[in-house]
Amino acid sequence: MVDEASLLADVDRQLHVVVATFGEPVADALGAIAGSGSRHRARLLLELARHGDHTLAVRGAAAVELLHLGTLVHDDIVDGSPLRRHAPTLHVALGVPVALWTADALYAEALHLADAVTPAGGLALGDALRRIADSQILEALGATTARYWDVVDGKTVSLFDASFALADESAGGALPAPLRDAVRRYGRLFQYVDDLQDIGGETDALGKPTGQDADNQLHTLPAADLVVSADAVRERLRELSGPIVRLASSTEWADHFAGMTQRLLDAAGRVLDRATV
């Protein structure tokens, strides 16, 4: 069996090939952002497809990362963020017009790669892109905390859904059904913790500015929970994390899901520890 590090290196090579097609100066500025990052979605996809076709899985993982990269470029423009993954954001480095068109091109490249997995894989990623756009429109129109999960399901869970779909296509449709729900719930926990880190995280550790949700008058659930108490956040984290572990418990990925869920809880715990000092 090919190890994850080798497959991730293959994913990175595909990303660099796409980045290089932009030429200078875009390739240099974009490469500084594309060459790092946690690769959460790619890692999950590769893990779920470990018994499948590795070539297809690498294509799918690269497609997901390219689409995610495009959304980050757009997000940074909307948020007015100067920093992403410890590097200047693309619109800061080269201006808004270049950043906008580069993100659009990344979406096209992502869809081409996903379609090369299977046509169904291409459709899954296209659906994720539409859901992302719809949720960002909802957020830009001033979604309240009551619509928080609608926004999250669109802008974050959609890409985890696509990761599962591309993994399943790479594995010949053999993934257990409960894992799909586990992945979706993980996506919700992932975004909740990310929003919590925006409130109380550290820029040096995250590689991006914090406090952007408040600066942009976005209404997030972690902010509302923190107004109640840190214990309210802890209770929410338990509600979000418990089903993930239970749904995956009967599969061979039980330990993997338990581990990645615990890492998110640990990250949230560090924020809460600082908030209550």
Residue ranges and their predicted role:
Residues 1-277:
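All-alpha prenyltransferase/terpene-synthase fold signal
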